[in-house]
Amino acid sequence: MEQRESEQRFSSRLAFLMSALGIAVGTGNIWRFPRIAATNGGDEGAGAFLVAWVIFLFLWSIPLIIAEYIMGRKSRKGTVGAFVSLAGRKFAWMGGFVGLVTTAITFYYSVVVGWCIYYFIQMLSQPLPATTEASWSLWNNYQASALPLFFHGIAMAVGAVAIWRGVSSIEKVNKVLIPTLLAIVVLSVIRALTLPGAWNGVAYLFTPQWSQLSNPKLWLEALTQNAWDTGAGWGLFLTYAIYIRRRYGIVKNAFVTAIGNNIVSLLAALMVFGTVFSILGMEGKTSGEILDVMKESGPAATGLTFIWMPQLFAKMPMGKMVAILFFLGLSFAGFSSLISMMELSSRNLIDFGLKRKTAIACVAGVSYIMGIPSARNLDLFGNQDFVWGVALMISGVFVAMAVMRYGVTALREKEVLQNKDDWDLSTWWDKNIKFVVPILGVTLLIWWLSLSATVYAPDDWYNPMSPYSVMTCFVQWGAVLAVLWWLNSWMADRIQSQTD
């Protein structure tokens, strides 16, 4: 007999932890973090960036993850219901915005997972591309075909199956994905570090050039990486927290999840830095030339992953095996995050009164259709990634505002301090949620919009049709907010009618 939604719970702490790590560990750990670390490194090393990155883990990511866990467990509702429960009826639109931002990311994230699946199959069945031209040919031929649509559909279908039975199927999938992913990452790191010259890359990664800390851009990039990397403020942890038992400590799991995520990012960086420095170093390239390769954004910011890594694997002993493991791990990382995004969207529909299977079918169908433009056009993909990636800063601030609306201290005392199974949580969390998170979120938002106006689209920042303009953000956010404000009372009524 199928368990009622209100009664579903994770079967164990381990099952919950694996699922929470599945949220945090995604493709960004493996392809974005090494590139951003290299981009923000100085002539001597990238260690200063790592320092700033760790600081923001404790100032942004962990406080927001704790807030999400509290909201989800207390309300037993998705993002809309949680905001209604904690902040009040008038703030249903805020929960809707948090949910829709992550749903919009789902549309094109599924396309990314499709890329990873395709490359895994290619690495498994075809010779590795040995030159830059061959690597570009592999990428361009794929993008020019109908295959991106096919693999986008495969990703959505697998994601739908993974959440079909609710938390019971989610935890079963993550119990396989996450340990396998961690094993793949560790094996890949070991192989990379045994290559000649690999430790030059490791030395660069961890050597601090302290003067870099005076560069505001480094701090903003470190904060952005935390905001995008851990999943804090997306509403994903809130959604999984619906299914946790009270004895599962919120604080301890928030720390383990966030720190575990950053460890995976560091392992991925060790693998990438070690491989790139070894192979290109043996070809006689200087450190500066090697770093130029690592900083290359490429198509849809994936140049290092899909253009350079395959040809580097082709030049190393046992490279085919490592390439297969690399793209299998990338696929697993993508899937573990994708299913949490699909569960968030489905859970909101369930809270509005839909049956789970109907909600999942709606989410999968709409997500596939809405992802088609990103699958067919990389400019549209880049636009959606920019617009909704920046909107995550607003989502993080909204989560903090919901907690403040209820009462930060009251929530900490009721939901954490009265739980003997959890770690203690001092007033640093209160201060972070009230002051630090809003300030950081607004600062990031202003910075990214200023980059749009001065760097990405300086000549047409006012043009809503320009992929990276300020106006394209305002128009798309404004359209979503207008609809949500119009539907606010209806959403609140539906949530409360289902609760009653």
What label would you give each PLM region?
Residues 1-31, 64-69, 73, 77-83, ...:
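Membrane-interface "cap" regions at the ends of multi-pass membrane proteins
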Residues 2-14, 171-339, 347-354, 358-362, ...:
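Membrane-embedded translocation segments of transport machinery
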Residues 4-7, 35-44, 79-97, 110-167, ...:
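Inter-helical loop and helix-membrane interface segments of multi-pass membrane transporters/permeases
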Residues 12-54, 238, 244, 253-255, ...:
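Transmembrane helix-boundary motif of multi-pass solute transporters/channels
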Residues 32-54, 70-72, 76, 86-87, ...:
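Transmembrane helix-loop boundary segments of multi-pass membrane transporters
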Residues 36, 40-43, 86, 90-106, ...:
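Membrane-water interface regions at transmembrane-helix termini and the short interhelical loops
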Residues 64, 106-131, 182-208, 274-279, ...:
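Hydrophobic alpha-helical segments and their helix-loop junctions in multi-pass secondary transporters
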Residues 88, 94, 99, 144-145, ...:
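C-terminal membrane-solvent junction of multi-pass transporters and transport-like membrane proteins
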